[in-house]
Amino acid sequence: MATWSNLSLQDGASPLMEQLSFFHDHTMIDLLLITMIVGYSLSYMLLTKYTNRNMLHGHLIETIWTALPAITLIFIALPSLRLLYLLDDSSDAMITIKTIGRQWYWSYEYSDFINVEFDTYMTPENELNTDEFRLLEVDNRTTLPMNTEVRVLTSASDVLHSWAVPALVLKIDATPGRLNQGMFMINRPGLFFGQCSEICGANHSFMPIVIESTSIKLFIKWLSNMM
């Protein structure tokens, strides 16, 4: 989520987020070129004093303004389709977690381990430390190992929710009575923040998500303390 003095996209913490950042830059370059061409054409038409009153058609210019948009769309569509395929790729996961949206907190279950279940509530503002973010800190962080394929299953117990962590390119709807899944891998240690991205009631803004990425050794130690 956006934090103080943070502009543009967040730093990617997964391979897919890095690919999406590259695609964003690629698309912005295409849009810049289109803006320059259209701006030059408009300026030329408005400022030139020369006109051709006898011109009835122009096959060349009609071919150009038909072909150029088609070529531009191809250059945007091909990497976009590749990313859509990668986002839906469900490779073998080493760890599976289940997150359940409730009004207004999250419940987590580590289904690969015994008795690893907990709830996460937003930390009140009067209990925050000086290095913690308002409306983004929780009492129990979700700890996961880095460089490990993780599958997250989402559901809800009451109304629609959405489990979203932008730095990991994750936004999975949590629907009552259904299980949705997403795959991701964290490639560096750190804290990654998210929030519920589906309006779910009065306290919708107070459902933060905090994922703590650690090494395998520290993750096993955390598991032993939770079990």
UniProtKB/Swiss-Prot annotation:
Drop me one GO molecular function for this one: copper ion binding
Q: Name one GO cellular component term.
A: mitochondrial inner membrane
Q: How is the cofactor bound?
A: Binds a dinuclear copper A center per subunit.
The cellular location(s) given in this protein's UniProt record come to: Mitochondrion inner membrane
Concerning SUPFAM superfamilies, the annotation shows: Cupredoxins (SSF49503), Cytochrome c oxidase subunit II-like, transmembrane region (SSF81464)
Q: Which GO terms describe its biological process?
A: ATP synthesis coupled electron transport
- What are the transmembrane regions? 27-48, 63-82
Q: How does it sit in the membrane?
A: Multi-pass membrane protein
Q: Which UniProt keywords apply?
A: Copper, Electron transport, Magnesium, Membrane, Metal-binding, Mitochondrion, Mitochondrion inner membrane, Respiratory chain, Translocase, Transmembrane, Transmembrane helix, Transport
> Which cofactor does this sequence's record say it needs?
Cu cation
Q: Which reaction does it catalyse?
A: 4 Fe(II)-[cytochrome c] + O2 + 8 H(+)(in) = 4 Fe(III)-[cytochrome c] + 2 H2O + 4 H(+)(out)
Q: Which PROSITE patterns match?
A: COX2, COX2_CUA, COX2_TM
Superkingdom of origin organism: Eukaryota
On subunit structure and binding partners, the annotation says: Component of the cytochrome c oxidase (complex IV, CIV), a multisubunit enzyme composed of a catalytic core of 3 subunits and several supernumerary subunits. The complex exists as a monomer or a dimer and forms supercomplexes (SCs) in the inner mitochondrial membrane with ubiquinol-cytochrome c oxidoreductase (cytochrome b-c1 complex, complex III, CIII).
The text of the family note is:
Belongs to the cytochrome c oxidase subunit 2 family.
This chain belongs to the protein called Cytochrome c oxidase subunit 2
